[in-house]
Amino acid sequence: MQRKQEMMTIVAQKQLAPRIYQLDLQGELVKDMTRPGQFVHIKVPRADLLLRRPISINQIDHSNETCRLIYRVEGAGTEVFATMKAGEQLDILGPLGNGFDITTVAAGQTAFIVGGGIGIPPLYELSKQLNEKGVKVIHFLGYASKEVAYYQQEFMALGETHFATDDGSFGAHGNVGRLLSEALAKGRIPDAVYACGANGMLKAIDSLFPTHPHVYLSLEERMACGIGACYACVCHKKGDTTGAKSVKVCDEGPIFKASEVIL
């Protein structure tokens, strides 16, 4: 995997929902962005904030050498990003991570795409690429409330889409686990499952598909270096009774088969 660093230029930025921002960047690094589910590590342009921030890639446009990121303002670093304007530059390291494996599904087959909250953005590029292969995509997307929901129309344009909110203000009342359970009860069995979101959601998916060979989970561990050097983002492997075997989410992931890791 190629890993490069570049000062990329901000092309546009806008707010999608409370604390949710869409950031478009332009630069040569985009040439190396190919697999959905990869991320970049962004240096905060402030001297007292040393650690880079990992943000997943939402869309890739090779023809214009642009990529789109969607992030949520969580602290001082992302607060700085939210104030930046078109024409300014950011120090970007990437692309990082292994990305989703889309080779296991073929045209005419069905993929469930499951996302929650800020885990939703990388699934858009995934859905686009699966569509291009002729795979039928069915989206299951969960939000805290209607107020913080975003990208509904974009996903609906790519395929069948089901929504859920914690408070019932939009879509089904509850989480995406409920939506998946209802789909399975109707006999809808996917050829592959792709998911990104909070650990609780991923655990629910793991329990719903305990023996499925093609369930891919994007883990949201905290990352410091982004290149596998600091061991801050490790998780343990299934089948390891010693507890000594682990994988580095930033370098060997962030996507793993559900059968590989302990959530």
Curated annotation (Swiss-Prot):
<feature type="binding site">
    <location>
        <begin position="77"/>
        <end position="78"/>
    </location>
    <ligand>
        <name>FAD</name>
    </ligand>
</feature>
<dbReference type="InterPro" id="IPR012165">
    <property type="entry name" value="Cyt_c3_hydrogenase_gsu"/>
</dbReference>
<feature type="binding site">
    <location>
        <begin position="53"/>
        <end position="56"/>
    </location>
    <ligand>
        <name>FAD</name>
    </ligand>
</feature>
<keyword id="KW-0001">2Fe-2S</keyword>
<dbReference type="GO" id="GO:0016491">
    <property type="term" value="F:oxidoreductase activity"/>
</dbReference>
<comment type="subunit">
    <text>Heterotetramer of 2 PyrK and 2 PyrD type B subunits.</text>
</comment>
<feature type="binding site">
    <location>
        <position position="250"/>
    </location>
    <ligand>
        <name>[2Fe-2S] cluster</name>
    </ligand>
</feature>
<feature type="binding site">
    <location>
        <begin position="70"/>
        <end position="72"/>
    </location>
    <ligand>
        <name>FAD</name>
    </ligand>
</feature>
<keyword id="KW-0479">Metal-binding</keyword>
<keyword id="KW-0285">Flavoprotein</keyword>
<comment type="function">
    <text>Responsible for channeling the electrons from the oxidation of dihydroorotate from the FMN redox center in the PyrD type B subunit to the ultimate electron acceptor NAD(+).</text>
</comment>
<dbReference type="InterPro" id="IPR037117">
    <property type="entry name" value="Dihydroorotate_DH_ele_sf"/>
</dbReference>
<dbReference type="GO" id="GO:0044205">
    <property type="term" value="P:'de novo' UMP biosynthetic process"/>
</dbReference>
<dbReference type="GO" id="GO:0009055">
    <property type="term" value="F:electron transfer activity"/>
</dbReference>
<keyword id="KW-0665">Pyrimidine biosynthesis</keyword>
<dbReference type="InterPro" id="IPR050353">
    <property type="entry name" value="PyrK_electron_transfer"/>
</dbReference>
<feature type="binding site">
    <location>
        <position position="230"/>
    </location>
    <ligand>
        <name>[2Fe-2S] cluster</name>
    </ligand>
</feature>
<dbReference type="InterPro" id="IPR008333">
    <property type="entry name" value="Cbr1-like_FAD-bd_dom"/>
</dbReference>
<keyword id="KW-0249">Electron transport</keyword>
<keyword id="KW-0408">Iron</keyword>
<dbReference type="Pfam" id="PF10418">
    <property type="entry name" value="DHODB_Fe-S_bind"/>
</dbReference>
<keyword id="KW-0274">FAD</keyword>
<dbReference type="GO" id="GO:0051537">
    <property type="term" value="F:2 iron, 2 sulfur cluster binding"/>
</dbReference>
<comment type="similarity">
    <text>Belongs to the PyrK family.</text>
</comment>
<dbReference type="InterPro" id="IPR017938">
    <property type="entry name" value="Riboflavin_synthase-like_b-brl"/>
</dbReference>
<dbReference type="GO" id="GO:0050660">
    <property type="term" value="F:flavin adenine dinucleotide binding"/>
</dbReference>
<feature type="binding site">
    <location>
        <position position="225"/>
    </location>
    <ligand>
        <name>[2Fe-2S] cluster</name>
    </ligand>
</feature>
<keyword id="KW-0411">Iron-sulfur</keyword>
<feature type="domain" description="FAD-binding FR-type">
    <location>
        <begin position="3"/>
        <end position="102"/>
    </location>
</feature>
<comment type="pathway">
    <text>Pyrimidine metabolism; UMP biosynthesis via de novo pathway; orotate from (S)-dihydroorotate (NAD(+) route): step 1/1.</text>
</comment>
<protein>
    <recommendedName>
        <fullName>Dihydroorotate dehydrogenase B (NAD(+)), electron transfer subunit</fullName>
    </recommendedName>
</protein>
<dbReference type="GO" id="GO:0046872">
    <property type="term" value="F:metal ion binding"/>
</dbReference>
<dbReference type="Pfam" id="PF00970">
    <property type="entry name" value="FAD_binding_6"/>
</dbReference>
<dbReference type="InterPro" id="IPR039261">
    <property type="entry name" value="FNR_nucleotide-bd"/>
</dbReference>
<feature type="binding site">
    <location>
        <position position="233"/>
    </location>
    <ligand>
        <name>[2Fe-2S] cluster</name>
    </ligand>
</feature>
<dbReference type="InterPro" id="IPR023455">
    <property type="entry name" value="Dihydroorotate_DHASE_ETsu"/>
</dbReference>
<keyword id="KW-0813">Transport</keyword>
<dbReference type="InterPro" id="IPR017927">
    <property type="entry name" value="FAD-bd_FR_type"/>
</dbReference>
<dbReference type="InterPro" id="IPR019480">
    <property type="entry name" value="Dihydroorotate_DH_Fe-S-bd"/>
</dbReference>
